[in-house]
């Protein structure tokens, strides 16, 4: 079985050989850093190190992908925000922004040459040279709503959504321009999958109507410029917005452990069927082709659980019909490799029993 082709089959709606097991979210862990002698924060700013660490869990645990980068601050940094690159077990964080109000946000003319964007694009090339024919290369990027939160501060953005909604929508549109430019640059580097992460659009932070009217249209516009397979990841209890997530035009949606996979699949069947015409995504109503990725708990089971806990949760997800098996969100840096291996082993054992 060719691992890459198997994953792409699933995302294309074709019959696959076996349910893939990979990660569409943050993939680096300390134990892998120690085994590869490649560490954070250096791997955030060095293309060779980023590629090595991004493929480390394929080499060490059998995970069926390489995935970069390791945070959601690349775009904000290129926009002029100050970013603390963190430590060996702490991901980068935005610490300061030059933007005081929504109207201040402007896209620098040389945005794609700033910050770590060139590092990410070069790391894609390194991974393609090493793994291009064997495993899918996944590149994560920040969605426009979450990026706006980085640029203005999440609390400020959420407050202004009530007080000055028009200003915030304009700011999200400016962030969308940034995301579209970056998505086009990533697409030109030709990874296999782009995963758009919109954690700030979780129902715990905004209500489903705000998602439908503010976030969803921008995610549709972003989907239209992505020229690879595309996955949408939203954190939290995303069950209330599954129907809308499924009708945006992404090949798959990634959900966390508090989402009922069986119910989500049922809701997807009632989602929006999409038709691509001239590169545009059109919502046609009816059934959707979006697949479900998830949802082994990254904060509990993979981080703190036993091997038996991991295998039990994998079995539950596979029985529920998950299309691609994956951690529910980014891996905690102190997650043990043994638990990642157990996720792969449990998938294999599941298929051994049904054959």
PLM-predicted stretches and their roles:
Residues 44-45, 70, 235:
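Active-site nucleophile and cofactor-binding loops and adjacent substrate-binding regions
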